[in-house]
Amino acid sequence: MTNDQVTALIDRHIDGWNRRDPTLLASNHAEDGVVLSPMFARVRGRAQIRDSYAALFAAFPDWQMQFGAPIVDGNRVAIAFSVTATHQGDFMGLAGSGRRCAFEGVSLYQLDADLLIKEERRVYDFTGLLAQVGVVRIRPAS
């Protein structure tokens, strides 16, 4: 597995995010892959991963991501991202609010021998996202 091969996979994955294409995104994951994220907890298997992407884009149809340069170390990749989106569909039991949200995070990937994502771990301020779309209220510190 070369850095160029890994970078090509990450480029395909970024393309899937930019197109908001659940099928393309899921195709980059191993059949038994796992995604760990604050939003969906643990999602296992390509079909469920695809469904989680579809649910995300249904709730936030204008979802936009910007990515930093990937950091590649063998079969591991880290990439920073920022998101802007408008809450327009069901999310966490809340109907679309029309509220804009923005947050930053990091995705950590572990790839398998077939150059597919075996595990993806997303780290971001989920409580801040929930507050921005009106699911929770946060009191300012006194």
Over which residues does each language-model region extend?
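C-terminal and inter-domain tail/linker signature
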Residues: M1-S142
